[in-house]
Amino acid sequence: MKKRMILGAMLLLSGCVQVDNYQAVVKHPAPAGLAGYWQSTGPQSSLVSPEAIASLIVTPQGDTLDCRQWQRVIAVPGKLMLDGGTFYNVTQKLDVYRLNQQGNTLEFDGLTLSRTDKPTVECQQALEKAGLDSKR
């Protein structure tokens, strides 16, 4: 038990965020400027191919959908977490990504996304399948 407390304190002090239980994460509503549809534009080194597309959908309630597509669609639901004034996207797979927004640009997981009016058709289908409210 002591080891866990020490490890937790070390992680907190080092600036790393770790999540061991998705259900225990408190979902935080999205600030007005963060809610909406975000999508990569052009090739990015963090994606598997120059043709790959990355999208992040953020609902006003704080639900997220990390949607990556190339030869198939991989969509992982998640939620926004606020820690020390910084927003993170925590996925159901326990991946934790810091969100850095500058106007209509959002950086996370080594990707640069731009605000868009609507998601791709494939990500919209994944959003509906996940049962998330996409109203922004």
Question: What does each of the following model-derived ranges do?
Answer:
Residues 24, 40-87:
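N-terminal glycine/threonine-rich, aromatic-flanked beta-hairpin/loop signature
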Residues 30, 63-69, 123, 129:
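A composition-driven surface/loop motif
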Residues 22-39, 131:
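N-terminal helix-cap/turn-to-beta initiation motif at the start of protein domains
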Residues 2-8:
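Sec-dependent signal peptide recognition
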Residues 17-19:
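Bacterial signal peptide processing site
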Residues 82-99:
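An anionic, turn-rich surface loop/hairpin at beta-sheet edges
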Residues 108-136:
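C-terminal partner/receptor-binding element of secreted or periplasmic proteins
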